[in-house]
Amino acid sequence: MSYTLPSLPYAYDALEPHFDKQTMEIHHTKHHQTYVNNANAALENLPEFASLPVEELITKLDQVPADKKTVLRNNAGGHANHSLFWKGLKKGTTLQGDLKAAIERDFGSVDNFKAEFEKAAATRFGSGWAWLVLKGDKLAVVSTANQDSPLMGEAISGASGFPILGLDVWEHAYYLKFQNRRPDYIKEFWNVVNWDEAAARFAAKK
């Protein structure tokens, strides 16, 4: 089995004016495609790992051959992270129900959660991701470097938990529209969060 670039469930301009068409198209067809290609190349002679869903593969990086660990950490990680990211974007959804109640329980309020998430995203030095994760029965905000995922575990990524929501803070995700204004990009994210997808991920793991 080889990995393939997932189709987006919306047009490249569907998130305008918050996320621009040109960035979405380049991000998906160039950056994400490169992670897919590189992951497949690294897995060519590793059928026991190539057969795994990418979300499972990145939980088993300590089992892959040492000379493939870094390339798969970066590129299988990039494929997994972006696949989640695209599904987590949609205009017009509302935070409600069990996920909203859990956020209010664990952060005190939705505004407190957003402030903590924005801080994690804005202060991640260089490239990386901010995440809302479920750890056991508690929600938490974490961030990871590069294409690391909380699914990789603390020993590799410095974070753990099941991702409910993720935001890409690599410059390629926002530079064409926002240049160096990462905080502005982060603020716009709230206008395109697919809360239905986040709620479904939460319900599947709670």
UniProtKB/Swiss-Prot annotation:
One Pfam entry name: Sod_Fe_N
EC number: 1.15.1.1
Cofactor(s) it depends on: Mn(2+)
Name recorded for this polypeptide: Superoxide dismutase [Mn]
Family: Belongs to the iron/manganese superoxide dismutase family.
GO CC term, one of those recorded: cytoplasm
Cofactor, how bound (note): Binds 1 Mn(2+) ion per subunit.
Naturally occurring in which organism (per UniProt): Salmonella typhimurium (strain LT2 / SGSC1412 / ATCC 700720)
Function according to Swiss-Prot or TrEMBL: Destroys superoxide anion radicals which are normally produced within the cells and which are toxic to biological systems.
Record's catalysed reaction(s): 2 superoxide + 2 H(+) = H2O2 + O2
The protein's enzyme class: oxidoreductase
GO molecular-function terms, A-Z: metal ion binding; superoxide dismutase activity
Subunit structure: Homodimer.
GO terms, biological process: removal of superoxide radicals
Binding site for Mn(2+): 27, 82, 168, 172
Alphabetized UniProt keyword annotations: Manganese, Metal-binding, Oxidoreductase
Record gene name: sodA
